[in-house]
Amino acid sequence: MKELVQQLRKDTGAGVMDCKKALQEANGDVVQALNLLKKKGLAKAEQKRTRSTTNGRVESYVHAGNRLGVLLELNCETDFVAKSEPFQLLAKNLAMQIAACEQVRYIEWEQIPSSVIESVKSQVAEQLVEQLANKPVQLRSQIVEAKVKKQLQKQCLLDQPFIKDEQLTVDEVIRTTIAQVGENIRLKRFARFVLGEETGEETGEETND
């Protein structure tokens, strides 16, 4: 039991008593206990996401060949967490994620300008004119909205599959780290630079602080 508790603590950052309780609830099944702890941790993380973040770090990543680079600002609540291994690893992983995601332009859906959404909606509706001709008006609208959301979500970092574990989204990875360190974490902005481009793509600030 002791070894299982230690393993769960290492994987989740949860306390000893929480790990023991999860193992008891899961009847000794480590995988089930891990899932229970993750669910509880993510629920706690949601409660922390409105808290102010005034510390953090600026992370940089330059891809092999020096033709692609990323700068990002990742915020947390205290200097202690900013210097912690989980936070620094998250910053590094996010920078690598951004480097790998050529289509990403925004941190989250709420940052997409309404003018961009309307423009894409018009394009999609025009492309589907013949396909939607015989469908009810309400259904046409639903189909267009779904296509628009699918297309634009590819540009939102938090919605992307995590490059190191595609069963998780980037947002879930951030929430897992929030649960692990016990503080709110917020990706404030990022810029992606490609050699030969006139400017890097930089996002605005998140809106949930």
Swiss-Prot record:
Domain of life: Eukaryota
GO biological process terms, semicolon-separated: mitochondrial translational elongation
GO annotation, cellular component aspect: chloroplast; mitochondrion
Record keyword NADP present: no
InterPro entries: EF-Ts_dimer_sf, Transl_elong_EFTs/EF1B, Transl_elong_EFTs/EF1B_dimer, Transl_elong_Ts_CS, UBA-like_sf
Subcellular location, record wording: Plastid, Chloroplast
Gene3D superfamilies: 1.10.286.20, DNA helicase RuvA subunit, C-terminal domain, Elongation factor Ts, dimerisation domain
GO molecular function, one term: translation elongation factor activity
Function: Associates with the EF-Tu.GDP complex and induces the exchange of GDP to GTP. It remains bound to the aminoacyl-tRNA.EF-Tu.GTP complex up to the GTP hydrolysis stage on the ribosome.
Protein name: Elongation factor Ts, chloroplastic
Organism: Cyanidioschyzon merolae (strain NIES-3377 / 10D) (Unicellular red alga)
